[in-house]
Design a protein with these regions (language model features):
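Intrinsically disordered, low-complexity domain-flanking/linker segments in eukaryotic proteins
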Residues: 125-126
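Conserved P-loop
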Residues: 2-122, 134-137, 148
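P-loop NTPase motor core
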Residues: 130-179
């Protein structure tokens, strides 16, 4: 018997084009379950909207078949925004480029994302699926948020710093590629 390898699928589209909504079609196969990992702050809400409003699937049909977790990119607080604004007002681009990072400790969401992938736990049910390197048979892993991943990688490199120099950009893109 030939052992088939699941096909990797890349679902690209503009914001609001229906990428998250399309994930619900996976549930048409009663033998499949969806692991939904999002970096979009509204991702889980969009998925729930697709389930309940677009496709109108009764909760009993999907409740034990979807496992979701979201890790949002960091956001600067008011004090950090003030610090960044003061720095911008006092330095030219060269001076900004020489900064080693601003408030990097507040932008470690990329590390959180790796930990979630290492030991995935559904935020809806508390179900632990473990290491996502090996997706369980009968499950489909959907990662919703390349933009969020890129933002997290950049923020890991520079924090809230308002500019990147070429080396910092290289570090951020290498981080995305390794993910």
């Amino acid at each position: 018997m030939i052992k088939l390898k699941p096909a990797p699928i890349l679902n690209l589209g503009a914001p609001g084009s229906g990428k998250t909504t399309a994930l619900v079609t996976i549930l048409a196969d009663p033998d499949l379950k969806l692991i939904y990992l999002s970096t979009d702050p509204n991702g889980e809400q969009s998925l729930l909207h697709a389930l309940t409003e677009v496709y109108k699937i009764p909760e009993a049909q999907w409740k034990n078949r979807i496992f979701a977790h979201t890790v949002e990119p960091g956001a600067a607080d008011w004090d950090t925004l003030l610090q960044v604004s003061e720095t911008i007002s006092l330095k030219n681009y060269q001076g900004l480029a020489q900064e080693s990072g601003i408030e990097k400790a507040g932008f470690r969401q990329y590390i959180e994302l790796i930990n979630v992938c290492k030991n995935f736990t559904c935020s809806w049910t508390g179900t632990r699926l473990g290491d996502l390197t090996f997706v369980p048979p009968g499950h489909v892993l959907a990662f919703d948020g390349l933009s969020g991943l890129s933002t997290m990688a950049r923020d890991l490199s520079i924090g809230a710093k308002p500019s990147l120099h070429e080396g910092e950009w290289n570090v951020a893109m290498n981080t995305v590629e390794r993910f």
